């Protein structure tokens, strides 16, 4: 939502056009938007965690793994949010991806159950879900329990982030829906 509003303000004020015609490489512009999205996401996450710690306490099994997966997840969702903002033509379109893509992926990503409880077919289908790898890496960082090898989880989240980054860079270079 915030990214979408920023995009509309940038188009209205012609800021994005100024960026696109500037001598700054597109990948640096993209990194700026991604860093902004990550900072906002991490800020909200830290505030929610601090608020939760007021009511309860929890241990962390591996602080480096937890920090790494939180950063990688915020990176991936920042890029995905930027792509969603580029494709959304109005405020209502912003909710299409979270409603029809993100929610089912979350429910099928092992958030509420172990994927070992699934049948072979659905377990194999779940292996194509990037949220499964984020959830399992985060679960390992907090509790030390995982269904998937932690290296494999980090590799898949990293691969998904690279693919999304390259797609966002392609959209930025093409100027898709950015130049009016």
Predicted regions and their residues:
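Single conserved hydrophobic/aromatic residue that forms the stacking wall/gate
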Residues: 1-11
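Transmembrane helical bundles of ABC transporters
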Residues: 14-15, 19, 30-34
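Hydrophobic alpha-helical interface/terminus motif in multipass membrane transporters
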Residues: 16-19, 51, 55, 84, ...
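Short helix-to-coil transition segments within interhelical loops
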Residues: 20-25
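Alpha-helical transmembrane segments and their short interhelical loops
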Residues: 26-98, 146-169
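Hydrophobic transmembrane alpha-helices
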Residues: 71, 87, 97-108, 122, ...
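Membrane-interfacial helix-loop-helix junctions in multi-pass membrane proteins
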Residues: 106-163
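Short cytosolic juxtamembrane segments of multi-pass membrane proteins
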Residues: 172-180
């Amino acid at each position: 939502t915030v990214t979408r509003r920023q995009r509309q303000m940038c188009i209205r004020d012609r800021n994005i056009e100024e960026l696109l015609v500037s001598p700054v490489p597109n990948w640096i512009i993209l990194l700026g938007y991604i860093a902004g999205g990550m900072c906002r996401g991490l800020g909200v996450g830290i505030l929610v965690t601090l608020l939760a710690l007021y009511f309860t306490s929890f241990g962390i099994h591996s602080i480096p793994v937890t920090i790494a997966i939180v950063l990688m997840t915020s990176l991936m969702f920042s890029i995905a949010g930027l792509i969603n903002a580029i494709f959304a033509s109005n405020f209502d379109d912003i909710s299409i991806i979270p409603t029809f893509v993100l929610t089912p992926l979350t429910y099928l990503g092992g958030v509420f159950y172990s994927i070992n409880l699934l049948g072979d077919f659905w377990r194999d289908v779940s292996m194509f879900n990037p949220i499964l790898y984020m959830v399992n890496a985060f679960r390992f960082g907090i509790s030390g329990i995982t269904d998937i090898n932690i290296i494999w989880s980090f590799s898949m989240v990293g691969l998904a982030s690279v693919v999304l980054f390259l797609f966002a860079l392609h959209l930025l270079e093409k100027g898709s829906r950015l130049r009016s």
